């Protein structure tokens, strides 16, 4: 199969157009898309935080992202990761940005650097060092004292980037200034001018398109990128469906949603009046940088994500006109050890004290987890990413149309949600019958009307939770109720959307009804192949999940019962506070005995229940977990050699905690270990 189906490549159109590899074409943009030497591309951007991964895992992480269909990487440069102590810069080890960029160059993976100075990313103070707050300077302002410090940061970053910009043959194609900024556009312009003065010279520059700026930046100077999430750990509510996240599952022309950063941004109204617009009616392309590839668990809100959460949202954004899907996060990580303090966001920190996040883990339930685990959503997204690459020149110029203009309402089950994108000759129909934590029923009597084409020939049923994209007038297909996946060497690959009957009408007059998948070995007609979703998810070079059990029962022993239950206090931002180090001194303590030898990819899998847990090696905290029903996992390859014992501390679940737990969590008061295994790929 690997000979039949090409492997995903980084910003793959570059390699298609320039097989000598990594020749630097000209990258531009217009109101529709990015262009590479004039040819339209529809990238998949995946966020990974290089400083949240050990340096020796970067290469495999980038390769695995590429295998998932990611064609561009985004990463924050956290100020307090590299200057935690004033004037003591640390670009070593996991903070070695230059080495990370060199790996991206080696792997032909373009990079967007999110420079800050403010980043957020659930990092302590949003990435701004503690020492800054002793100076009495207003952050994120045009105060010359702040800009002087920002310039020092940018100059330091440039020492890492120099010679690795796109114009140099390097991977850095763009940078983002600040993050979720709502003040005057002149501040962002000051950062851009500063960066260019230092030496940054990139094909394009970006900002987050939310919230609305108090005053705009001149059109064309900085591209706004948007985002959306299926749920948010930052919501104050402990109800299952807090906020307006249902809007992420409706096709709509509005690029700005009021779901992001609601703990810090008060949205008076959400309007698309200025979103993507410039002087004289010119407009920006619809790009995203923060589509929730997963979601973190905060202490007060233990969100549990499902594969269709990210998949449905991605299809909806693509069907709403987006020509760059940027996931936050695509690869999870672990907070590095701080020199002065923990580096996670908490309600006790001086800034970004909105939520309590785990001290160490930043797994994010992402497609690739904290230790590179290929989660179900990784495979769910792969066929979509292949489609975006192989049909990008057809898709990119297409305009989005919205047949149903009803206002989005939570759980609205009265109609099938759909849109189509068309250039007047060809089209793609996008539909979504899924909404997170809502039951949408099967939709009967469905036919789509696009131009002069009505299909299928007879009304059909779209099952509950079905999500898909149907071609009209593309690749020799007049219409199909199957989803295009890819094309290669004259062959065209489609997949059946689960539960949807397949009807394919070809331009030559041939019609196939009730088509059945035959895999990649046997065409359904001429050079057309019909696959199952599972076959499409495994096409080409992929990443093996941790599915092999190396050790069924890892020995463990309870060394100490839990002490008195802690009092769960409400913090400054009106949500429950996470346990302190002192609280964990009262936790139940278990000793885990490891085997004498371990495979290089041994993953510890702890099935426990309780409020939260911490894992220690030789007395040092190495990872932690806010319980939400998923297993607590740890990559044993990160341990010092000859580590024989680990210590697990679990705080008991309490009755009626002021915390949202999903239905997958065991909320029985108390704590315990169900099993501990060692897995491998």
Task: Kindly label every feature range from the protein language model.
Residues 596-617, 625-626, 648-649:
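Aromatic-lined ligand-binding clefts that engage carbohydrates, nucleic acids, or primary amines
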Residues 135, 146-160, 168-176, 182-192, ...:
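Carbohydrate-binding surfaces of carbohydrate-active enzymes
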Residues 1-24:
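Bacterial Sec-dependent N-terminal signal peptides
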Residues 648-656:
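Short beta-strand-plus-loop segments that form exposed binding edges in beta-rich domains
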Residues 22-72, 102, 674-676:
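N-terminal carbohydrate-binding accessory modules
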Residues 106-112, 119-267, 272-297, 319-322:
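Active-site region of glycoside hydrolase catalytic domains
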Residues 58-124, 192-197:
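Aromatic-lined substrate-binding rim segments of carbohydrate-active enzymes
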């Amino acid at each position: 199969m690997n000979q039949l189906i090409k492997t995903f490549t980084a910003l793959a159109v570059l390699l298609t157009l320039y097989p000598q590899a990594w020749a630097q074409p000209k990258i531009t943009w217009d109101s529709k898309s990015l262009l590479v030497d004039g040819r339209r591309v529809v990238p998949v951007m995946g966020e990974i935080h290089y400083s949240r991964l050990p340096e020796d895992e970067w290469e495999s992480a980038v390769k695995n992202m590429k295998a998932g269909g990611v064609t561009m990487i985004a990463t924050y440069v956290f100020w307090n990761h590299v200057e935690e102590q004033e004037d003591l810069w640390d670009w070593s080890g996991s903070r070695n940005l230059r080495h990370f960029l060199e790996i991206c160059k080696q792997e032909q993976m373009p990079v967007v650097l999110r420079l800050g100075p403010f980043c957020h990313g659930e990092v302590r103070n949003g990435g701004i060092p503690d020492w800054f707050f002793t100076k009495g300077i207003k952050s994120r302002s045009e105060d010359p004292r702040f800009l002087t410090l920002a310039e020092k940061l940018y100059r330091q970053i440039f020492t890492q980037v120099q010679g690795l910009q796109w114009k140099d043959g390097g991977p850095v194609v763009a940078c983002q200034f600040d993050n979720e900024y709502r003040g005057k556009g002149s501040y962002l312009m000051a950062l851009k001018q500063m960066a260019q003065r230092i030496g940054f010279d990139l094909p394009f520059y970006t900002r987050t398109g939310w919230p609305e700026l108090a005053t705009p930046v001149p059109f064309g100077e900085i591209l706004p990128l948007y985002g959306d999430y299926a749920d948010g750990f930052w919501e104050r509510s402990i109800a299952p469906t807090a906020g307006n996240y249902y809007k992420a599952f409706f096709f709509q022309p509005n690029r700005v949603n009021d779901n992001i950063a609601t703990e810090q941004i008060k949205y008076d109204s959400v309007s698309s009046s200025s979103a993507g617009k410039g002087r004289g009616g010119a407009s920006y392309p619809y790009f995203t940088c923060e589509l929730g590839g997963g979601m973190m668990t905060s202490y007060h809100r233990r969100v549990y994500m499902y594969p269709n959460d990210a998949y449905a949202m991605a299809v909806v954004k693509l069907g709403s006109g987006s020509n760059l899907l940027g996931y936050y996060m695509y690869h999870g990580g672990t907070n590095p050890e701080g020199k002065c303090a923990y580096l996670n966001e908490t309600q006790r920190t001086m800034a970004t004290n909105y939520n309590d996040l785990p001290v160490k883990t930043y797994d994010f339930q992402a497609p690739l987890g904290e230790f590179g685990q290929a989660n179900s959503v990784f495979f769910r997204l792969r066929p979509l990413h292949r489609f975006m690459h192989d049909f990008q020149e057809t898709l990119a110029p297409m305009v989005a149309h919205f047949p149903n203009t009803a206002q989005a309402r939570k759980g609205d089950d009265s109609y099938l949600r759909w849109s189509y994108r068309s250039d007047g000759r060809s089209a793609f129909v996008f539909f979504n019958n899924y909404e997170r934590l809502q039951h949408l029923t099967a939709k009967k009597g469905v036919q789509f009307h696009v131009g002069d084409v009505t299909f299928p020939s007879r009304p059909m049923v779209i099952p509950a939770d079905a999500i898909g994209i149907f071609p009209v007038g593309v690749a020799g297909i007049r219409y199909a109720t199957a989803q295009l996946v890819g094309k290669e060497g004259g062959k065209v690959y489609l997949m059946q959307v689960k539960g949807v009957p397949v009807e394919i009408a070809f331009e030559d007059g041939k019609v196939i009804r009730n088509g059945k998948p035959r895999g990649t070995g046997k065409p359904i007609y001429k050079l057309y192949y019909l696959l199952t979703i599972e076959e499409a998810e495994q096409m080409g070079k992929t990443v093996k999940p941790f599915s092999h059990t190396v050790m069924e029962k890892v020995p463990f022993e309870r060394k100490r019962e839990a002490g008195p239950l802690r009092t769960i206090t409400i913090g400054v931002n009106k949500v429950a506070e996470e346990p302190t180090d002192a609280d964990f001194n009262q936790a139940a303590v278990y000793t885990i005995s490891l085997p004498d030898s371990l495979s290089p990819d041994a993953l510890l899998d702890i099935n426990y229940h309780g409020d939260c847990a911490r894992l220690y090696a030789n007395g040092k905290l190495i990872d932690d977990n806010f319980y939400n029903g998923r297993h607590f996992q740890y990559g044993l390859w990160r341990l010092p050699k000859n580590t024989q014992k680990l210590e697990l501390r679990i705080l008991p679940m309490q009755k009626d905690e002021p915390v949202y737990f999903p239905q997958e969590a065991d909320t029985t008061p108390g704590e315990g270990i169900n099993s501990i295994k060692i897995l491998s790929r």
